[in-house]
């Protein structure tokens, strides 16, 4: 959900250095930003941040004269880590961590989509401030990244999802937020194509070119509950049985229980277990349609431009739905019917055939 904010900073001339979970390294490889894995102990985390700051100072003499660190996390520990490393931080004020922030930002007074919250908190880095800590104003670098803006008034978009409304953050007016966009590496695409070959989903044409056959990706896995209700749509097995006669269905479970569930509950699907995250993203991008719960792969599918049918139950869609130009949101209490989802899947498949 942070991708719109990261690209916004990139387009404002920032040379990003990202620090986060290990899985972010392969996932963001196509963005060309250095990604550093956050260590486990306080000493190691502070050492990493100090080292990054030291390296950046050799390239940027004004690094210490302005805000230089954006905290997209809400944790107390992330603010403490950055403060101990001597960084000038901007982040949301909460849980007593405002004392450690150079520029604490007040929490939004109204609920916002998480992507919009990230977008708003980065505002001080992309607009001048009167206290001498102005963000850099270098011209944005040339970029091949598309800049597709969702509607800024919160009305439903043509694909059935709702775009977040731009809201005024403290001391600046947030510009319209871009869609999340995740580019893929050539290596990830090649690895995905190899897996599709192995699954019989690539056809050689008369002119020697390879053609990927239409397939659907189902993401029936969702961990945890919300207000005591499962976030996993119970209609996935039935949907899979109805789709298999029409086109191949691909499942990409994680290790352990998910793999067992995939092979037990979806015997007619083609299961690829343990797929690396960047290759997973490429397989989603090549699909005719993706059907997902409220789960990370749903957001991933939207970010790589896949046609996503997002099936939600108890999730607060206004805050956590997947965003993208090809996202169709289906939500009903307690859950949508299989026929309703299948109808939207057919529409997505028809749109894929037209391209």
What does each model-found stretch correspond to?
Residues 1-355:
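Catalytic machinery of carbohydrate-active enzymes
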């Amino acid at each position: 959900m942070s991708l719109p904010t990261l690209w916004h900073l990139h387009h404002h001339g920032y040379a990003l250095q990202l620090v986060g979970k290990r899985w972010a390294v392969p996932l963001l490889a196509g963005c060309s930003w250095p990604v550093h894995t956050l260590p486990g102990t306080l000493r190691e985390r502070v050492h990493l941040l100090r080292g990054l700051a030291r390296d950046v100072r050799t390239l940027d003499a004004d690094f210490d004269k302005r805000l230089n660190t954006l905290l997209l996390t809400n944790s107390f520990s992330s603010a403490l880590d950055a403060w101990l490393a001597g960084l000038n931080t901007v982040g949301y004020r909460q849980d007593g961590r405002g004392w450690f922030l150079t520029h604490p930002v007040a929490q939004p007074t109204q609920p916002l989509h998480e992507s919009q919250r990230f977008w708003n908190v980065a505002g001080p880095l992309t607009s001048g401030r009167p206290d001498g800590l102005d963000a850099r104003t270098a011209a944005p670098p040339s970029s091949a990244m598309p800049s597709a803006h969702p509607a800024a008034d919160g009305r439903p978009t043509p694909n059935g999802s709702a775009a977040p409304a731009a809201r005024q953050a403290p001391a600046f007016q947030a510009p319209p937020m871009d869609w999340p966009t995740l580019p893929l590496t050539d290596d990830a695409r090649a690895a995905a194509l190899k897996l599709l070959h192995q699954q019989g989903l690539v056809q050689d044409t008369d002119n020697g070119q390879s053609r990927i056959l239409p397939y659907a990706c189902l993401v029936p896995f969702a961990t945890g509950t919300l207000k005591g209700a499962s976030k996993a749509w119970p209609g996935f097995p039935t949907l899979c049985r109805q789709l298999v006669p029409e086109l191949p269905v691909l499942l990409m479970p994680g290790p352990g229980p998910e793999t067992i569930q995939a092979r037990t509950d979806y015997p007619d699907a083609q299961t690829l277990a343990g797929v690396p995250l960047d290759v997973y993203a490429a397989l989603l991008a090549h699909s005719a349609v993706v059907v997902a719960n409220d789960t990370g792969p749903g957001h991933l599918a939207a970010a790589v431009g896949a046609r996503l049918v997002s099936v939600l139950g108890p999730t607060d869609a206004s805050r956590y739905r997947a965003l993208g130009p090809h996202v169709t949101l289906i939500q009903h209490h307690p859950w949508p019917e299989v026929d309703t989802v299948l109808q939207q899947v057919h529409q997505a498949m028809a749109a894929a055939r037209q391209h």
